[in-house]
A protein has these predicted regions:
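Residue-level signature of catalytic and energy-coupling elements of molecular machines
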Residues: 11, 24, 41, 57, ...
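Conserved redox-active cysteine motifs that mediate thiol-disulfide chemistry
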Residues: 26-43
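Non-catalytic, surface beta->alpha helical segment in thiol-disulfide oxidoreductase systems
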Residues: 77-101
Length: 101
């Protein structure tokens, strides 16, 4: 499954109402560690059909970033049934991201 670009308009439908767990990657284009995590998140999205993967650009979607209390990036959040079940700040290897799920 491909990565979904999450914004305030599709957040409710794609994340809150999802019947699958959702891995969210809060990032910014200028963030070096975010650029390290991005291809890993893309890879997970392609490999795992049992989850949704979304990316949220904090510069464009600052309301969503604030709602999640994201002040450092990259921040990875796992949501199930519309609730946060796991969260990690900073770059992580693939194994650690998969373990969050």
């Amino acid at each position: 499954m491909s990565v979904i670009k999450i914004n305030k308009f599709n957040f409710q439908n794609e994340v809150k109402n999802s019947d699958k767990p959702v891995l969210l990657d809060f990032y910014a284009d200028w963030c070096g560690p975010c650029r390290m995590v991005s291809p890993i998140v893309d890879e997970i999205a392609e490999e795992r059909n049992d989850i949704k993967v979304g990316k949220i650009n904090v510069d464009q979607e600052n309301e969503l970033a604030e709602a999640f209390g994201v002040y450092s990036i990259p921040t990875l959040v796992v949501m199930k049934d519309g609730k946060i079940v796991n969260q990690a700040i900073g770059a992580r290897p693939k194994e650690q991201i998969l373990a969050m799920l």
